[in-house]
Amino acid sequence: LFRSAFIRGKIQVQDVSSMLVAEVADPKKGDYVIDVCAAPGGKSLHMGDKMEGYGTVDARDVSQYKVNLIEENIQRTNSINVQARVQDATIFDQDSELLADVVIADVPCSGYGVIGKKPEIKYRVTPQKQDEIVILQRTILDRAANYVKPRGELIFSTCTIAKEDRS
């Protein structure tokens, strides 16, 4: 029953912490939302659903592979107000400046918040890698902040518990 509902696009599997992003953002019908690191699209789909099909969720990610993941979920769920495109979040998109009611930046991180599910993380993240991640996060946030229109919202999110990833 669960598998059938998932395949038909009636349900979307999402971690509680990911789900909270859309709840905090609370987009309204007609809003324009940009999700800068969107793959595989769960937050974008949730935002579009909360908007009841009105407005647009612009789900972006760095590669065609990641955008394909988003598009598969858009098609599976028949989401009419979510669109996906390749856009490197570290490169400023002048066409999006001051346009978005909500910008979601669920940036790459060390992953310490999901270490229980992915124990190999503790062997993969070095102090140097951590420093590189923080620089990447700050670059993405700097770009994303420019897309928020006056009185809009920028939602910063990571799946980590590392202080460096959250400051």
Identify the meaning behind each predicted range.
Residues 2-167:
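S-adenosylmethionine
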